[in-house]
């Protein structure tokens, strides 16, 4: 139904589907993976009752910034995507959208996102500039370092300190524990994603943690996930979160264990499904946080 709704936009403009594919709006997994940790932070900062205005601002901000990140990523990879089977038909690589159109669209998405941030406060506005820098920098990292997933993790976690400053006007040191936890989690699940392209990336010289980790990939991913949970346990104790929060972490741990088992043969599609599966871990943690505050 969701896909049909998006495709119906072609009736308004025959090129609408090209821009939907460019922003990955037809593949909302990236929205979920960015949204859940942002909401973790927003709920904790608001002690279970964040302002409705901030909820709207951050949900819309997640959708827009993720879309913008996809656009700038495809623009940066426009000469590479055509050599990778999975990405060869992306709109810029396939010539459906020009480089100039992509840059203008990216600027438009970031401009609207910034207008949302202007509805918060000075501290959040300043922090948003760091998020913009990370979003623009990430796509180029895979050319120079084996750690582009770390930059992605920093970018995908940047909404968390922003949530604290928007909701409270302050940024407690403990909030950075949440940031670190999400960074570790992101590096883990994006390594699963990178494992699906590892063979192609080796041929064209693109770097990733999947290549760096080699045969130790799954063990390192699981280690990162366990460390992420450890950071969340520490943060939970500082923020006085209780049983429901820890039950959410337990469900997430179960998700990670299943992913480790499921990818035992490193089949491409299994690695991709493991990447997608991380959305449920993020949701479980969010539900745990919500229930922990709601049932006090």
From Swiss-Prot:
This is 4-hydroxybenzoate octaprenyltransferase. It comes from Pseudomonas fluorescens (strain Pf0-1). Its cofactor is Mg(2+). Keywords: Cell inner membrane, Cell membrane, Magnesium, Membrane, Transferase, Transmembrane, Transmembrane helix, Ubiquinone biosynthesis. InterPro entries: HB_polyprenyltransferase-like, Prenyltransferase, UbiA_prenyltransferase, UbiA_sf. HAMAP family: UbiA. It is an enzyme of class 2 (transferase). The chain crosses the membrane at residues 28-48, 52-72, 102-122, 146-166, 169-189, 219-239, 241-261, 275-295. One of its GO terms (biological process) is ubiquinone biosynthetic process. NCBIfam families: ubiA_proteo (TIGR01474). It is a multi-pass membrane protein. Catalyzes the prenylation of para-hydroxybenzoate (PHB) with an all-trans polyprenyl group. Mediates the second step in the final reaction sequence of ubiquinone-8 (UQ-8) biosynthesis, which is the condensation of the polyisoprenoid side chain with PHB, generating the first membrane-bound Q intermediate 3-octaprenyl-4-hydroxybenzoate. Pathway: Cofactor biosynthesis; ubiquinone biosynthesis. Belongs to the UbiA prenyltransferase family. Its EC number is 2.5.1.39. One of its GO terms (cellular component) is plasma membrane. The keyword Membrane applies.
């Amino acid at each position: 139904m969701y896909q049909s709704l998006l495709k119906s936009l072609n009736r308004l403009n025959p090129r609408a589907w090209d821009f939907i594919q460019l922003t990955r709006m037809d593949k909302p997994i990236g929205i979920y993976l960015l949204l859940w940790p942002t909401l973790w932070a927003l709920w904790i900062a608001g002690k279970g009752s964040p302002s409705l205005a901030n909820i709207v601002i951050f949900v819309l901000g997640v959708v827009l910034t993720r879309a913008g990140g996809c656009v700038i990523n495809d623009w940066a990879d426009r000469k590479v995507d055509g050599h990778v089977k999975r990405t060869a038909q992306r709109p810029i690589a396939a010539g459906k959208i020009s480089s100039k159109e992509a840059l203008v669209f990216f600027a438009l998405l970031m401009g609207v996102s910034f207008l949302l941030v202007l509805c918060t406060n000075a501290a959040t506005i300043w922090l948003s500039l760091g998020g913009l820098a990370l979003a623009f920098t990430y796509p180029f990292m895979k050319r120079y370092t084996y750690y582009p997933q770390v930059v992605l993790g920093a970018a995908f976690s940047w909404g968390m300190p922003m949530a604290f400053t928007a909701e409270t006007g302050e940024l407690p040191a403990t909030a950075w524990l949440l940031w670190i936890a999400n960074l570790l989690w992101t590096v883990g699940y994006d390594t699963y994603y990178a494992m699906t392209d590892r063979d192609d990336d080796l041929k064209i010289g693109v770097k990733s943690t999947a290549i760096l980790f080699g045969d130790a990939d799954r063990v390192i991913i699981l280690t990162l996930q366990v460390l992420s949970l450890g950071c969340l346990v520490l943060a939970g104790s500082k923020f006085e979160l209780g049983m429901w929060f820890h039950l959410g972490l337990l469900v997430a741990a179960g998700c990670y264990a299943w992913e480790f088992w499921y990818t035992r043969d490193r089949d491409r599609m299994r690695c991709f499904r493991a990447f997608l599966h991380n959305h449920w871990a993020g949701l479980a943690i969010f539900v745990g946080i919500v229930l922990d505050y709601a049932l006090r």
